[in-house]
Amino acid sequence: MVNLQRRLLTTMIALSVVVPVVAGAAPLLGQETVYVMSNNVEKNQVIAFERKNDGSYFEKNRFDTLGRGSGGVNDPLESQGSLTLNADHTVLFAANAGSGNITVFRVLGGSLWVTDKEPSGGSQPVSIAEWGNTIYVLNSGGAGNVTAFRLNGSGQLHPIANATAFLSANATGGSSISVSPDGETVAVVERIAGNIDTFHVNADGMLSAAVVNPSTGAGAFSARFAPDGKLIVSETGPANEVDGSAISSYTVLPNGKLAAVSQSVPTDGAANCWNAITPDGKHVYVSNAGSSNIAGFTIGTSGTLAPIAGTIVGSNPDGSTNLDIAISGDGKFLYSLNGEVGTVGVFAVRPDGTLDEVTQIPGLPAAAGFNGIAAL
């Protein structure tokens, strides 16, 4: 089996030379496609669902990562970004938490071709971020760290020398990683410790030591940079507080410290763990996993957050745990990964930021540990 996997990987890499992986290359897109990672402990896969002309979706294919997931049920990774597209949607990265490596796929018409699989540089990779062919991997296990790689034109990863930086301590629960639009700052949320770490990126790709910022709100879980450079952070809220989740925004100062802009704006729901920002930077949506709904906010010019239409803009099936959300590259659709019911919710994004439910894509097991979602 090992030899077979190696031969398959070699074949995929050879094929990738025909269509090089180059940042800025025109993406070869098919119909609207959304990807979900199975995170299966024996054989991790990426499941592709494609939109038909009538607006319905079908399972296009399942693509092996050649690695292993963590297994478990209902959000075992407790992270955002385990499945990540690059900026121009020509490359997809998958974190194999069980086998400790990263798989690189070339995206061709919605289908995926493996171009590389490399050790993550630590234990239990759970989140991946990309900026200009530099790839950052968050390893949450053991002495949690961020490891940086270069992606070459053939879709292969190469570790950057001395470009591993550690989190504030062991077992802090690293749960998300994001890179600023200018590529100069990497932000990591330590879910258990309640910190937001920032790392300055030097010209040679090396990362500074972590600047540790205590979150202004309880339960920081995921952070995403908006196109204007503001950092948007989802907060689950104080323990045992009903519908106590919130969202905050920050400015990153030159010294790596964070200055709050909007502090703990209520999301009117429970367990807000994930957020997704529209490509134009005007709106952010958060996933209230504990109350099966989606809240929306307008992002002001200074980074202030204001609720859209009474805050709750979308609902998922009763009893579902919406694990993660993603927005399509054109900003027209929002996708919600729904645990406990095994669906992907599809919503159309209106110009004013409100959502219209389109459909629920079936086909995922109701009780399984799938994690990660990304959309073309």
Which ranges hold each PLM region?
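A short beta-strand motif characteristic of beta-propeller blades
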Residues: 60-74, 113-119, 160-167, 208-214, ...
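Aromatic- and glycine-enriched pocket-lining scaffold segments that form the walls
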Residues: 136-151, 158-222
